[in-house]
Amino acid sequence: MEGTPNVPQAHRYELTLAGRPLVLETGKYAKQASGSVLVRYADTVVLATAQASETPVEADFLPLTVEFEERHYAVGKIPGSFMRREGRPGEKAILSARMTDRPIRPLFPKGFRHEVQIIVTVLSADQKNPPDILGPIAASAALMLSDIPWEGPIAAVRVGLIGGSFVLNPTLQELEESQLDLVVAGSKEAILMVEAEAGEVDEETLVQALEFAHKEMQPILELQEAMARELAKPKMAWTPPESLPEEEKEALYRLALERGLSQVLQTASKGERSRALAEFAERLIAEALPKGEDGTPDEGKKPLYESAFDEVVRRELRRLVLEEGKRADGRGPKDLRPIWIEVDVLPRAHGSAVFTRGETQVLGTVTLGTGRDEQILDDLGIDETEKFLVHYNFPPFSTGEVRRLRGVSRREVGHGNLAKRALKAVMPKEEDFPYTIRVVGDVLESNGSSSMATVCAGCLALMDAGVPIRAPVAGVAMGLVWEENRAVILTDILGLEDALGDMDFKVAGTRKGVTALQMDNKVGGLPREVLKEALLQAREARLKILDLMEAVLPAPRPELKPFAPRILSLKVPVEKIGLVIGPGGKNVRALEELGVEVDIEEDGTVRIYSSDLQAALEAKKRIEDLTREAKVGEIYEGTVTRITPFGAFISLFPGTEGLLHISQIAPGRVARVEDHLKVGDVIKVKVHRIDERGKIDLIRPELEGKIPPRRRR
């Protein structure tokens, strides 16, 4: 690295992680940001900046945005768009932004309402070490150095499982052979976020992997703490939003219990509960509001009471779970909601299913496509295609709301990716089922756990389509209520329980093991036993769901649906690929006139796609005829194409002809070939010899032994 003499000296903090240098650097770049850190891991480099607005905004939530920006120069490329510049973030960038957002969000102080923006920019990608795990580390370090109040640090690591051993931060090449792709983010005391894709890994191995990850991230946390001790700015002064004094909150809680809050909360239907709760809140707040001397309520305090009422509801829901083992819809902690399933629900879809669990309902569909339907991946520097696609749609009517449809949200991208990871482990190999497969999960109703319902609906739709998956997959969302060393694990959580719990995690898998895991922890460190128990309780629920799914459709259908395309595959010699294509693509165009699509790969693999099986078979026959090679001793029905004084040329199949010498046409002396054969005659001939130049000598099989074969000079 070269520069002028006055280049500022950066502050560097370094350690070795999985045999590669991890460097945190600050003080040289992006110095006007409140916090900025350059993180380098091997030759992958990201820059993270943290900035907060000077004044708070009117909101009842933390206005945090996290952006993950990929620059094509990071891999030495120019963007392929018309404008030749980066556009909207791709799916991988969105998932990386979510991976950074989720572990840092819970660590902002309650009530902090200043806008916070974290931008992680990938400056260099060595295409060996994925940049996504550097996002949480860099964002954490930038926040630690900034004046933004935040209770970090956090760190993130990736864990693989190769040959029965855990591998820390596996490279992209190592991930291809790994049975596990586990990303864990956490603080010193706790695991805060988990994202995992697994090849049917058992629960005990997962717990061990989580412990391994948490142990290995500790040096990264210590490095950030050392940096912050020396360089961190004083934290900005901020004023928490006004709230009711604790004694008034307590009085409101007692009054709510007296007026029957517990009974209102235990209304089975989501809609009825919401309406009853809104009416109850209105009556309760009207009664609880302080009154003036003339009896007029103090309306100025109403927003404070409305906010306090939300805390009252959360407190009572948690009490019901912890002390009475009761949930909002009347279930016990381990109970699943009622489930009903339908398959083959759409007449033209290649596969379809509806999976309904309580008030959550997903329509799953499968479409089978050709090689031309593969998705071109938008990953930074990766020129690959994807044959398995899973898309998740969450329309507003699914929750009884009205809002604009503004394209795919980050949440939809994240949930679709989770469902994809859950199903990917059981998908057939390309050579066994060479289709492009698109699964779509349309959420028709939602009251919690819609991503896991998408896994179930998607799996059933795959089986309905006749996709030979290795095993059925089901998923379930779990929750945890934790207080004073008491833990209650909740199976199949409602949307309401998702908000009140201390940890939510989604587990998908087969009877054999877990294929996908997503976890967000909102409390401190959880004992190993609690994590293990939660995973085992999820397994118990998963097996019950699989029983119900298999009762409807025990295995993939043996045949594809009538409207699904058929694929025929064959292999042609590489040197004959040009013959199949023809001059200027003439032969391929002629094949496509049959109503088929033809894909030809560099190794000579030819795939023929058509919804008309007969058309596909005809196309296959034509290709076989084009690429056939004559074999000595084989008999063919050939057509006379030319007559010469020394014999007749016979076409055995398109592109291949041989010579039937005049001496082999008939017994005795033949004066003129035309006396025995004419152009267009169809006769049986046998390949007698093929010389080193590929020239073919033919004989008539019925005269074999009666006429001595011709000898070449």
From Swiss-Prot:
Gene Ontology annotations of biological process type: mRNA catabolic process; RNA processing
GO MF: 3'-5'-RNA exonuclease activity; magnesium ion binding; polyribonucleotide nucleotidyltransferase activity; RNA binding
Name of this chain's protein: Polyribonucleotide nucleotidyltransferase
Top-level enzyme category: transferase
Family statement: Belongs to the polyribonucleotide nucleotidyltransferase family.
Organism: Thermus thermophilus (strain ATCC 27634 / DSM 579 / HB8)
Compartment(s) of residence: Cytoplasm
Cofactor needs: Mg(2+)
Catalytic activity, as annotated: RNA(n+1) + phosphate = RNA(n) + a ribonucleoside 5'-diphosphate
Record's keyword terms, sorted: Cytoplasm, Magnesium, Metal-binding, Nucleotidyltransferase, RNA-binding, Transferase
Enzyme Commission number(s): 2.7.7.8
Residue stretches making up the S1 motif domain: 633-701
Functional description taken from the UniProt entry: Involved in mRNA degradation. Catalyzes the phosphorolysis of single-stranded polyribonucleotides processively in the 3'- to 5'-direction.
Source taxonomy: Bacteria, Thermotogati, Deinococcota, Deinococci, Thermales
CDD domains (alphabetical): KH-I_PNPase, RNase_PH_PNPase_1, RNase_PH_PNPase_2, S1_PNPase
